[in-house]
C-alpha cells in the first residue's frame, strides 16, 4: 500500500498520480472467498482526489452510462431507484442493488427492500461492484449503494472515468467525535464528490487482476510450471477495455531477473 504523498518510480517524466489497493477484499482473500482483486489506477499529476487526514469512509452511489444523470446521492433511496429504473426503461423490481454486508447498512437495506428492488450483499471489495454497476455489458448489478472506503472511491472513479457511468460520494464520519474533528479542520461534510471531482484528469488508466475468482475476473491459478492470471485494463482517452489472460512461467521469470 502507498501512503498519501509517497513518491514512486524512476524520477523521470511523465509525472502521474497513482492510486493502488494491493488487495481489494482482504477479508475475502483471508477466507478464500471469491472476488479479491489487486487494483491500480493512474492519472495526470495533481488530478486525483487525495482524502484529507481523518477521512476514511464515504457514502457512495455508482451506476452505468445510461443512468449517469439519474442519480442524486442526497435523494432518498426510493427516488434514486425510481429514476434509475426509468433511465434503464425497467421496473424497480428488475434492479439489483449491491450493498456491502455491514450493520451500518441496515436502514439502506430496509429501504431498498421496501420498494421491491433485489439486493446483492457483498462481503468486501466495493471497487469490483462499482465497476460492474457501470459496465454496459454486465447486468448482474445495476447500482452500488452504501458506505465504503475513501481510497476505494477514487479507484472506482478511475475505472468509471474510463468506461462511462457516474459515481457520487460524500464523506462519512464514523462517529460524532470524528464528525466534529473534520468540521474543525474545515471539511465540508455536505460536499458531493462526483466522478470528475475524484479523478479530474482526461488521461486515466485503470487495471485490476483477480486474486480469488469472482464475477469480474478469474483468480490466480497455480500450476507446476507457473501461474495464470486474469486482468482487465481500461483507458479513458479511447474508452477501450481489454481483458488479458496471462501465463507466467517460473523458469522464464527467474531467467529474466
Name every feature range the model reports, one short phrase each.
Residues 1, 51-52, 109, 217-220, ...:
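Short, glycine/acidic-enriched capping/hinge loops at junctions between secondary-structure elements
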Residues 1-44:
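Flexible, acidic active-site loops/lids enriched in D/E/S/T/G that coordinate Mg2+ and/or position polar
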Residues 2-5, 57, 122, 245-257:
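Catalytic, metal-anchored helix/loop core of enzyme active sites in primary metabolism
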Residues 27, 69, 144:
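A short glycine/serine-rich beta->alpha loop
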Residues 32-34, 55, 200, 225-226:
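A short, structural micro-pattern
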Residues 43-88:
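Glycine-rich phosphate-binding loop plus the immediately following alpha-helix
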Residues 74-226, 230-235:
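An extended, acidic
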Residues 224-257:
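Extended hydrophobic packing segments that form well-structured cores
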Amino acid at each position: 500500500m502507498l501512503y498519501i504523498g509517497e513518491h514512486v518510480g524512476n524520477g523521470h517524466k511523465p509525472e502521474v498520480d497513482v492510486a493502488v489497493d494491493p488487495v481489494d477484499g482482504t477479508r475475502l482473500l483471508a477466507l478464500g472467498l471469491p472476488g479479491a482483486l489487486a487494483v491500480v489506477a493512474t492519472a495526470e499529476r495533481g488530478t486525483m482526489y487525495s482524502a484529507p487526514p481523518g477521512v476514511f469512509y464515504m457514502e457512495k452511489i455508482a451506476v452505468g452510462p445510461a443512468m449517469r444523470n439519474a442519480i442524486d446521492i442526497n435523494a432518498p433511496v426510493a427516488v434514486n431507484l425510481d429514476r434509475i429504473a426509468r433511465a434503464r426503461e425497467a421496473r424497480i423490481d428488475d434492479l439489483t442493488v449491491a450493498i456491502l454486508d455491514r450493520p451500518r447498512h441496515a436502514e439502506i437495506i430496509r429501504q431498498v427492500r421496501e420498494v421491491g428492488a433485489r439486493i446483492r450483499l457483498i462481503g468486501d471489495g466495493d471497487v469490483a461492484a462499482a465497476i460492474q454497476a457501470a459496465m454496459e455489458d454486465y447486468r448482474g448489478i445495476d447500482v452500488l449503494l452504501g458506505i465504503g472506503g475513501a481510497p476505494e472511491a477514487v479507484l472506482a472513479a478511475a475505472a468509471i472515468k474510463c468506461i462511462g457511468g457516474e459515481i457520487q460520494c460524500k464523506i462519512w464520519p464514523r462517529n460524532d467525535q470524528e464528525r466534529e474533528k473534520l468540521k474543525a479542520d474545515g471539511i465540508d461534510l455536505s460536499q458531493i464528490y462526483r466522478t470528475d471531482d475524484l479523478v479530474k484528469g482526461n488521461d486515466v488508466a485503470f487495471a485490476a487482476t483477480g486474486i480469488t475468482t469472482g464475477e469480474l475476473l478469474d483468480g490466480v491459478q497455480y500450476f507446476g510450471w507457473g501461474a495464470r492470471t486474469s486482468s482487465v485494463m481500461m483507458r479513458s482517452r479511447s474508452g477501450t477495455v481489454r481483458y488479458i489472460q496471462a501465463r507466467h512461467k517460473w523458469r522464464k521469470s527467474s531467467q529474466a531477473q
